[in-house]
Amino acid sequence: MNQNFQKEKNLVLDYYKALDKAEGDEISKVLSSHIGKDYIWRGFHPFNEQSDAEELSKVFWQPFRHAFKNMQRRMDIFIAGKNQIDGFESVWVVSMGHLMGLFDNEWLGIQPSRKMAFLRYCEFNKVQDGKITETAMFFDIPHVMIQVGLTPFPPQTGAHLVQPGPMTHEGLLFDEQDAAEGEKTLASINFMVEDMRDWKHTNELPLVDELRRSWKEDMIWWGPAGIGATYTIERYAEQHSGPFRASFKDRISNGHLCKLAEGHFGGFFGWPNLTLTPTGGFMGMPATGKPGDMRVIDMYRREGDKLAENWIFIDLLHFWKQQGVDILERIAQNPRN
């Protein structure tokens, strides 16, 4: 049996079409005509939460579009589904990819390159009664910094690159999908989350064997700038999962606000998902003794009964600011570091 989220998908696609061609004050009008009452927008630091179309346009969209000329939305994943977190009541539409443009003007203290630049993004939109009532738009600002030659963090353990979409090139689900496939994907995501929630197998299984319970051997972890991307279970364990687990204490799971799947793709976001205290070593940073929140989006591709790819968006600027390190301030003070 197919799931039909065509109405919600088309609404979001129409919104993107209008937003992406709007300029200046037109952006506010597009936002106002598509968002509902009591709207809330959640974005990464320094934008955080916004609830007014005019303010969202002024604070985020207009400055970004002024900096990134001739912007193109290059989607790699487009799905919709019902939210497991509220008992499968609400419908959300998810878009992931890059916003590409000519980086011609300063943005957030980052000096322009006058060359192509890509902002990694993933956006969850809740659709109710013909309007978008809630948005989580997470994006990788440090990735833009690295593209223009800045070094916001110490050397990362994974690879830096403009990240591609799914290996299968089948992430744009504009049409109806078999509901059973989405259920399988959600089950695979849930199994993985529960299996590692307390890192409970650390003393029972080698990390690579624990990961094999959820992941394909040739899995790809597309991590954010500052951590980087890694390929195969063994390299993922070596270059991210192992160091990450060893670098924190007092790990608290705060849960998610939305979790859904459609076809072979799915994901979730939280605000925040995790609270952790650094013990030293993560991203080359020292221990602070301060708990910090991580706002995260995870998107997945399933293959068979296991996960094959994972795209991750972490608000590292927000996390490190809580630890006393203001990356944006550093960049503004030393724009050609």
Predicted feature residues:
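C-terminal and inter-domain tail/linker signature
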Residues: 1-337
